[in-house]
Design a protein with these regions (language model features):
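Cellulosome-associated attachment modules in secreted, modular CAZymes
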Residues: 453-532
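Extracellular adhesion/carbohydrate-binding repeat motifs centered on closely spaced tryptophans
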Residues: 18, 237, 267, 271-290, ...
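Sec-dependent signal peptide cleavage junction
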Residues: 1-12
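Structured segments of extracytoplasmic/periplasmic soluble domains
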Residues: 57, 80, 103, 195, ...
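Structural signature of tandem-repeat unit edges
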Residues: 13-22, 31-49, 59-72, 82-95, ...
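A recurrent domain-boundary module in secreted/ectodomain proteins
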Residues: 265, 438-454, 524-532
Length: 532
């Protein structure tokens, strides 16, 4: 950063500042200049740096000579220099900065010295004429979008010194045919090779443990790939639309497979023909060709995102208790699915999980989940009633938006957060909850009708009596031996009189005490009973 007292000057077509006790930084040039030679010294002072955006949008500039005295080239220095065809970065420069050559569409050749250790974000973004580049051995990091849409780049050598290739580094390099990822890389980050449509061969080293979202998406010429044994996770859409991919070697080490990983590949099509339920290492990755009633086999531990995306022929599904997670958009727009029971083994459900399931009329959620995700039941127009389990603490953004048939939702006291527009366009909705609860506050603030349900009144008779005590005792006894309790979620919420988020013998005691006091004419409140 320049000090307030920095001395300014000009040298031919160049402008500069005197910085750092007598060093020169080039700060700009005449916009119509075609050729520039930066001197090593100006007025006896060494030229050591070129400032941020110094030659930005100098579209007439076709050649430039930079002296070895320059050790720092700023961000965006040659951004948009569309006439520049080649450049040599001087020895001593340590990085190719943010957007340094971004938009240099005529740049065909660049020499990067061994002194450079990093290539920053979008450094060569859109350098559409660049055909090859050699990255020197000293480089350790290639940052996000560094070579984004270098559409003429056919080959690139990445040295073993590189340990980090960031998101989208080679995204859209449509002429790139072959690449070897060095041994030091531990993760292939998101969209790194997205849209490399000419890529036919890639070597993934044994050091890699994860492949991120969309890493190879749209690599339409890739025919085979071997995933090394240390990889444990593959992100969503990692190989999406690899339309020539027929052979994939996937080790047992891969235990986390996200959504749409192999969508639109010949490999997946072949698997679907063998069995419409495509299961890989315990993850159900695809069931989009299923019709009618489907039973997921025991042993499946997760349902990947988009597994049944737009599976309009699916009418019913049985999920085993081995399943612990259901991914984003797993049942997105399954318009013929009418009801679903989620087992209590499931602890998480992704965003959009039942979004657009217009035929869904009944959903049973377990006490094992703690949140209703964003867009989870958006546009489920057939749903009329929903009971949120006591375990849930938050309801996400747009969770029930446009579920226009929804007239009743029971929200327990455990819920303390409801996201933006969660119930938008649910015009006939009544929220049921306890007086003084967050649900009541939310309903009033958002102009939604609220109905309070009474503690202890399980049969909605308007009073708490021996019938309610019997129902509660029956529930507690059955649950204690592992049987279904026989109560709805709404009844369970009413039976949990002590607010412990569970129904047990303590609730039975308080109900008996409450009924006994009222039986002898004492009109006590629940607050008074619980205070005893």
């Amino acid at each position: 950063m320049l000090s307030a007292s920095a001395e300014e000057g000009t040298y031919g077509s160049l402008s500069y500042d005197v910085i750092n006790a007598g060093e020169i930084e080039i700060t700009g040039c005449n916009m119509d200049v075609a050729s520039v030679e930066i001197p090593a010294e100006i007025a006896g002072k060494r030229v050591t740096s070129i400032g941020d955006n110094a030659f930005r949008d100098c579209t007439s500039l076709t050649e430039i000579t930079i002296p070895d005295s320059v050790t720092s080239i700023g961000d965006g220095t040659f951004y948009g220099c569309t006439g520049l065809t080649e450049i040599t970065i001087p020895d001593g420069a340590t990085s190719v900065g943010f957007q340094t050559f971004s938009g240099c569409t005529s740049l065909k050749k660049i020499t990067i010295p061994d002194s450079v250790t990093s290539i920053e974000n979008n450094a060569f973004y859109g350098c559409a004429s660049l055909t090859e580049i050699v990255i020197p051995d000293g480089v350790t990091k290639i940052y996000s979008g560094a070579f984004y849409k270098c559409t003429s780049l056919t080959e690139i050598t990445i040295p073993d010194s590189v340990t980090n290739i960031r998101v989208g580094a080679f995204c859209g390099c449509t002429s790139l045919k072959k690449i070897v990822i060095p041994d030091g890389i531990t993760s292939i980050e998101g969209s790194v090779f997205y849209g490399c449509t000419s890529l036919t061969e890639i070597t993934i080293p044994d050091s890699v443990t994860s492949i991120w979202s969309s890493a190879f998406r749209g690599c339409s010429s890739l025919t085979e790939i071997t995933i090394p044994d240390r990889v444990t996770s593959i992100g969503d859409s990692a190989f999406y639309s690899c339309t020539s991919l027929t052979e994939i070697t996937i080790p047992d080490s891969v235990t986390n497979i996200e959504g749409f990983v192999f969508t639109d590949t010949p490999w997946l099509t072949a698997k679907q023909e063998e069995n419409p339920l495509v299961i890989l290492n315990g993850t159900l990755i695809d069931g989009t060709t299923c019709t009618g009633s489907v039973t997921i086999p025991d042993g499946v531990t997760s349902i990947a995102g988009g597994a049944f995306d737009s599976c309009t022929g699916l009418t019913a599904i049985a999920i085993p208790k081995s399943v612990t997670s259901i991914g984003d958009s797993a049942f997105y727009r399954c318009t013929s699915l009418t009801e679903i029971t989620i087992p209590d083994s499931v602890t998480s459900m992704g965003d959009y999980v039942f979004d657009g399931c217009t035929g869904l009329t009944k959903v049973t959620m377990p006490d094992s989940i703690t949140s209703i995700s964003d867009y989870a039941f958006r546009s489920c127009t057939g749903l009329t009633e929903v009971t949120i389990p006591d375990s849930v603490t938050s309801i996400g953004d747009y969770a029930f938006r446009d579920s226009t048939g929804l007239t009743k939702i029971v929200i327990p006291d455990s819920v303390t957060s409801i996201g933006d527009s969660a119930f938008d366009n649910c015009d006939n909705l009544i929220i049921y909850g306890h007086t003084g609860s967050f649900a009541e506050t939310y309903a009033k603030e958002h102009g939604i009708q609220f109905a309070a349900y009474t503690f202890g009144d399980l049969d909605n008779s308007g009073k708490v009596d021996s019938t309610d005590i019997f129902y509660t005792m029956y529930y507690v006894a059955n649950v204690a031996v592992g049987n279904p309790g026989g109560l709805t979620q709404e009844q369970i919420a009413a039976a949990d009189v002590d607010g412990s988020d569970k129904v047990d013998s303590t609730d039975v005691f308080y109900m008996m005490y409450y009924v006994a006091l009222h039986g002898v004419g004492k009109d006590v409140s629940w607050e008074e009973v619980l205070a005893k």
